[in-house]
């Protein structure tokens, strides 16, 4: 009965420890997943804000050129310099009446860029367009249209995914190392307890034998004295 109760207590403790470990790991993984989602949203917003900021700065630069009646070559040169950005595919300048004033040297037809003239389904997810008004003191001078590659943001997300996959792997390794360490400590403690118990039992047996020998010796002396 005592052994059954002891086994039940041990099984209950082991089950509680396992449930607690699973709960802790679940909470950690949930927190990591939430942090991953937040990082992805932050990276998307960062890329979007950066692209809008660069386009707005370029529009301010083109505003000065349009006010000074710059030539088409100057506008094209400015657009080519802007198109060297990693995410920019092409850019065009339109007047406030919608007339095309200049475009990049590697300008592609808008319909061709978006795949509207292609018999296949256009890949709208890979390209996006931003139209930024070009302001001056006189009002709207024109519009800047920029086609940029949305894969730039996806590349950032893929890097974040890769980093978090590494983090998941490290968490699993840490968990397994903790299990191994706990098992090793449990083994050595159990071995130490068994060894200590044997030594204690041997000492008790020796003391008992010594007492028995002393008792026998005194009994013999009493018999001899009689």
From Swiss-Prot:
Protein's cellular compartments: Cell inner membrane
Keywords from the named record: Cell inner membrane, Cell membrane, Membrane, Transmembrane, Transmembrane helix
GO cellular component: plasma membrane
Topology versus the membrane: Multi-pass membrane protein
Transmembrane segments: 12-32, 169-189
Pfam families: SMP_2 (PF10144)
InterPro entries: Uncharacterised_Smp (IPR019305)
Predominant place of localization: membrane
Physiological role: When anaerobically expressed in wild-type E.coli K12 confers a hemolytic phenotype, but not in an sheA mutant. Suggests it affects the expression of the latent E.coli K12 hemolysin sheA under anaerobic conditions.
Name recorded for this polypeptide: Protein AhpA
Organism: Pasteurella multocida (strain Pm70)
């Amino acid at each position: 009965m005592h052994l059954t109760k002891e086994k039940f207590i041990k099984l209950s403790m082991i089950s509680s420890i396992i449930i607690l470990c699973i709960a802790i790991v679940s909470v950690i993984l949930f927190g990591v997943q939430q942090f991953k989602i937040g990082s992805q949203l932050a990276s998307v917003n960062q890329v979007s804000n950066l692209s809008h900021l660069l386009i707005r700065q370029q529009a301010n630069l083109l505003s000065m050129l349009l006010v000074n009646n710059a030539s088409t070559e100057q506008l094209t040169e400015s657009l080519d310099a802007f198109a060297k950005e990693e995410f920019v595919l092409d850019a065009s300048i339109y007047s406030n009446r919608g007339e095309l004033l200049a475009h990049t040297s590697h300008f592609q037809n808008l319909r061709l860029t978006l795949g509207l003239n292609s018999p296949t389904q256009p890949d709208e997810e890979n390209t996006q367009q931003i139209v930024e008004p070009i302001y001056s003191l006189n009002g709207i001078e024109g519009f800047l249209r920029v086609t940029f590659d949305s894969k730039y943001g996806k590349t950032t997300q893929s890097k974040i995914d890769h980093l978090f996959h590494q983090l998941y792997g490290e968490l699993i390794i840490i968990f397994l190392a903790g299990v191994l360490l706990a098992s090793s400590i449990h083994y050595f403690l159990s071995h130490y307890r068994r060894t200590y118990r044997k030594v204690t039992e041997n000492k008790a047996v020796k003391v008992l034998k010594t007492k028995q020998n002393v008792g026998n010796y005194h009994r013999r002396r009493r018999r001899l004295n009689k």
